[in-house]
Each structure stands twice: as structure tokens, then as C-alpha cells.
Amino acid sequence: MFPKSLAVSRKNSNLTKGVSGLRRLCSSSSTITGSPCPPRYDVAVIADLIEKQHWSKLGVHVTDINPNELFRQLISSELDPDLCLRYYSWLVKNSDISVSLELTFKLLHSLANAKRYSKIRSFLDGFVRNGSDHQVHSIFHAISMCDNVCVNSIIADMLVLAYANNSRFELGFEAFKRSGYYGYKLSALSCKPLMIALLKENRSADVEYVYKEMIRRKIQPNVFTFNVVINALCKTGKMNKARDVMEDMKVYGCSPNVVSYNTLIDGYCKLGGNGKMYKADAVLKEMVENDVSPNLTTFNILIDGFWKDDNLPGSMKVFKEMLDQDVKPNVISYNSLINGLCNGGKISEAISMRDKMVSAGVQPNLITYNALINGFCKNDMLKEALDMFGSVKGQGAVPTTRMYNMLIDAYCKLGKIDDGFALKEEMEREGIVPDVGTYNCLIAGLCRNGNIEAAKKLFDQLTSKGLPDLVTFHILMEGYCRKGESRKAAMLLKEMSKMGLKPRHLTYNIVMKGYCKEGNLKAATNMRTQMEKERRLRMNVASYNVLLQGYSQKGKLEDANMLLNEMLEKGLVPNRITYEIVKEEMVDQGFVPDIEGHLFNVSTKS
């Protein structure tokens, strides 16, 4: 704390500086606009009024000069920029006068010259947050009115930061690019929040652009910046590029940390395809070799990745290693294992894991119960599912929509449609709004029971609410095709398009399969033409399988043979279903396919 005398001395020094600046200003024969300050001004009083924020008195005192003009003259003087900032704030708040960008950024230049950086940050944050409608190019023109590139760079850097912190990522990205055009050097402190804002909007390509520009402009990245870039690349499956960025870190003297490795491991786990978990495991080994200890997040990522790769033993091995290293599992760890066990039909082991979870002091949550109820339903254990559902409600927890949907689906699959509808009504009484999944379960149940009319009625209710999705249409289409009414299924294509939904291969395959089962190969072929010409969807393996089976079962084996050759000529690889159709519908019927120049061994099943 400064002595009182010193504080007063400093205040008087600011006031003296303000007074001397105004004295020079008002003794000048002309202003910037050529209008002299009225000679009767008591400049000491003006400065003192601004210092003390006596704005009503100031307004009376300067009636002979435009407030905006006074602001221009204050900035041009040697008045302390803090006083100019106070006057600006008062002017904007208490008058209809709009301050030009040129004057606004002159103020910021004066603050930057005085090294009042925190005030610039605060000013720009409010400037952006309050919805400034100024275009970025106009702002940069105003910034460039000062010849000091260093000062301009500081202001541009803080502007990008303000845009990023206020979720104005579009403007922040444009400001970043314009900074490059003007030659203003930004810092990692503004680039990192900008990249995070872009990443939240799934603009990974723009994150990669910012990173490359940082390298080109010689902006020193830090470990946090690198981690954001790695995350963006992993989200889009660019794992090789993410690996390259890890190498770049070393070049810039940054060591990858646990977040870097976790992001890369998670990227491999979510990538899909053969060998993904082998690569994730390799990153884990590299991590340990570089003396970076795996944490709870690392283990959770691997547990989840292994069971989703149909490698439940791998998940259990990671869980054991986790315990061996004294890393305490959390609810996410247990939920992943319970999900994996339920998915693999190991219900009793899933229940046992839930019990271990509780014994370890980790309380199950709705995700835990969702996983267990889903496991019960998938394994025809409806009674156990309902008991657990009752237990959830008994604990005062509110069941999720997904939980209700699983039970409704289980009822419908057992043919207990009325019970499914009763549960939907209970759901609504509890204030839980049924979603499209709820209706899809009920429509599917009605279709399976052959009650297509009731299914269509429920579909129409859903349509009136604007809720149907592609799954809804597919369910009803399959219902019509199952009843031998494929023409009605085909008519739903138009309704689908009216709702802005785009048919996929599966959509057309359902209708083609329906026509083939009815023996109407001409209609099936017309549907293929519609798919290829109107929707520009090329036949895939599943589409060819539908027609292959249709032609074969109709006894048109030569035509089926031609389709098989056409499929191979287009470079499509037969799958297990293709081989089964060829064997059962062609070879076993005494017809050996004539494959023209292609290797096709019917004894092999891929």
C-alpha cells in the first residue's frame, strides 16, 4: 500500500498532465476540424471533472463544443489515456453520438503506447460482446492508421482473443487472416482460444489452417496449441497428420504430455477399421517409454475402445492394469465395462461388476442402469429389466426417454403391443416427451404383428409433429413389403423427399427386395434406375445381393450371372451374403456361374 502523500502526489501528477495537455490543446489556434476551442474554457476544470467523473457538470461546462469533437481533441493531446477512456465510456453510454472506428482505435493506440494492456483487453471484450456490427476489414483499416506495427500487432492479437472468447469464431477467423495480410504478428495466447472455438464448431480444417499459418508466420506454438491441433486432426480421422504434429512438438522444444497421448489414443480407438486398437496400444507403450504416466482418462479410453472393437478380454486386461497401478476407476470406467459385458451377453458378470462398483464407493448413474436394462432386453429378460426400471424409479431418479424406449421395444418384440402403448402413456404422464425412437419402436411392433393400418396411422401422427426420420420410413416400408404391398412402400419415397429426407441405398434396397419377393423383377429394376439416375446413388454390394437373389429365385440364372459379372467389373468386393446367394441359389441348383476374367471361389466366404 502506498503512503497517502505518495498516492495524492501521483493523482496530482495525472491531473497536472491532463491540465497541461488541455491547456496546449485549447491555446491552439485551430483543432483537427479547424474549429478553435472556446477561449473561456477552464481546462483545469475539464480535466478535473473527467478525473472525478462529474459528468453532469462536464456536460454543462462544454456546451459550446461537440462531445465527439472534444474526444478527438483529447486523444490528440497528451492527456492521460485513462482519462480519455473514461470520457469515451461516458460519451457512448450517455449520448446518441456514435464514435468512429478511427477515433476508437486511436484511443486503443494511446492505451497501447502507455502499456495499459489489461484495459485494452477489457475494452475489446466489451466491444465484441456488445455486438459490434463493424466489419472486420473496416476495423483493420482503423488499426492500420497508426504506423507502429508493434502496437498494431498487440491490438490485433487482443481483438482475435476477444472474438474467440465471445464465441464469434467467424469474425475471429477473419481477423486472424487479416492480421497476416497486414503483417501483424499474433501470439499463441490468441491463437489457442481461436482454435478451440473453431474446434467446437467442428471446423477442423480451419484449425489446421491456423496451425500452418502460425508456423509460417513464426508464431511460437506451445503444448496447449499443439494439443488442440492434434484433437482437430483426430476428430477427422487424419491420424498420420496428428502423428506428424506430435513430431513437430519435439522440433519446437515441446514434449507431448498426457493430454497429447490421450487424444492420439482416443483418435485411434474411434477411427475404426482393422488394427485400430493395436495402434492405440502402441501409442500407450510409447507414452510409458517417454516417462508420461497413463491417467484415469487413458485407461477409460482404452477400456471403451477394446469392448467396442469386440475385444472384451482386452477391456478387462486394461481394467486390471488400472487397478494394479493404483488408479481408482470412476463411474465412466465401470459403465464402459458394464456396457461391454451386456453387449457380449454376459449379464450375470455385468451385474457382478455393478456390485463391485457399489462396493468401491462409486454410485451407479442413469447410464449404468440404461446399459443393464438394455442388456436384459436384448437377452429376453424383460422381467429383470422391469424390476431394475422399478428400482430406478424407487430411488427417486427420473428414467430417461432411452430407458422407456428400450422397454417399449422389448414389449413390442414379444408381441405385447398394448403393454408398449401403456408404457408410452405412463411416460407422458410423468412429463417425459416421447421422441421419434419411441414411435419407431411402436410402429415396428405393429408392422411385425401385421397391423400395417395401425402402423400407418401412428406414422401419420408422427408426421403431423414433423418427427419422422429415415428409420421411421424404413420401418414402414419394410412393413408394406412384408405384406406384399411394395408399391405403397415405393410411394413413401415421394413423401420422404417432401419432408427433406434423402433416401439412401438401404431405402431403395428395401423396396427392391420387396418387389423381388413379389416376383416383380421389372419394378425392382425400375427402382434401381430411379436410384442411379434420380438420386445418383451407385449400386453397392447390398443392392447387387438383393437383385442377385431376386433373379436367382425367379429362375433367371443367366441374368443373375450377368449381374454378378457387372458387380465384379465395377470393382465391388463380394461379401459373405454374396457367396451364400451364389452357392445356395445358383451352384446348389446345378448352375455354375461363368465369371469372365475374375477370380471367384464359391467355397470361400469373406
From Swiss-Prot:
<feature type="repeat" description="PPR 5">
    <location>
        <begin position="295"/>
        <end position="329"/>
    </location>
</feature>
<feature type="repeat" description="PPR 9">
    <location>
        <begin position="435"/>
        <end position="465"/>
    </location>
</feature>
<feature type="repeat" description="PPR 4">
    <location>
        <begin position="257"/>
        <end position="294"/>
    </location>
</feature>
<feature type="repeat" description="PPR 8">
    <location>
        <begin position="400"/>
        <end position="434"/>
    </location>
</feature>
<protein>
    <recommendedName>
        <fullName>Pentatricopeptide repeat-containing protein At1g09820</fullName>
    </recommendedName>
</protein>
<feature type="repeat" description="PPR 3">
    <location>
        <begin position="222"/>
        <end position="256"/>
    </location>
</feature>
<feature type="repeat" description="PPR 7">
    <location>
        <begin position="365"/>
        <end position="399"/>
    </location>
</feature>
<keyword id="KW-0677">Repeat</keyword>
<feature type="repeat" description="PPR 6">
    <location>
        <begin position="330"/>
        <end position="364"/>
    </location>
</feature>
<dbReference type="InterPro" id="IPR002885">
    <property type="entry name" value="Pentatricopeptide_rpt"/>
</dbReference>
<feature type="repeat" description="PPR 2">
    <location>
        <begin position="187"/>
        <end position="221"/>
    </location>
</feature>
<dbReference type="Pfam" id="PF13041">
    <property type="entry name" value="PPR_2"/>
</dbReference>
<feature type="repeat" description="PPR 1">
    <location>
        <begin position="152"/>
        <end position="186"/>
    </location>
</feature>
<dbReference type="InterPro" id="IPR011990">
    <property type="entry name" value="TPR-like_helical_dom_sf"/>
</dbReference>
<feature type="repeat" description="PPR 12">
    <location>
        <begin position="540"/>
        <end position="574"/>
    </location>
</feature>
<feature type="repeat" description="PPR 10">
    <location>
        <begin position="469"/>
        <end position="503"/>
    </location>
</feature>
<feature type="repeat" description="PPR 11">
    <location>
        <begin position="504"/>
        <end position="534"/>
    </location>
</feature>
<comment type="similarity">
    <text>Belongs to the PPR family. P subfamily.</text>
</comment>
